[in-house]
Amino acid sequence: MIPGELLTDDGEHTLNPGRRTLTLVVQNTADRPIQVGSHYHFAETNGALGFDRAAARGMRLNIASGAAVRFEPGQQRTVELVDFSGDRIVYGFRGLIQGKL
């Protein structure tokens, strides 16, 4: 096994079935790349990423655990977000929530 390798059955797989998702267009206005991991609270990402932060509150990237999305300088891309589950308590990141969503 290779670290990070996904071993799955054949066929199509759906991540986070039954959970609310949101599609957003995100623009990197910085002069450097910005990378966001799978479980980072998307509303608290680097301020140089331009998107509707209020809409992204309580959500993360809808990608496989441990994966990340990289935004190159000036790049605009569409991402899908998914609601955090469980107790929906967020600590850390940029310190903007520090508690229940």
Swiss-Prot record:
The keyword DNA damage does not apply. CDD domains: Urease_beta. Its EC number is 3.5.1.5. InterPro entries: Urease_beta-like, Urease_betasu_sf, Urease_subunit. Pathway: Nitrogen metabolism; urea degradation; CO(2) and NH(3) from urea (urease route): step 1/1. Transmembrane segments: none annotated. GO terms for biological process: urea catabolic process. Its main location: cytoplasm. It comes from the Bacteria. It catalyses: urea + 2 H2O + H(+) = hydrogencarbonate + 2 NH4(+). Keywords: Cytoplasm, Hydrolase. GO terms for molecular function: urease activity. It is found in: Cytoplasm. One of its GO terms (cellular component) is urease complex. Gene3D superfamilies: Urease, beta subunit. Heterotrimer of UreA (gamma), UreB (beta) and UreC (alpha) subunits. Three heterotrimers associate to form the active enzyme. Belongs to the urease beta subunit family. This is Urease subunit beta.
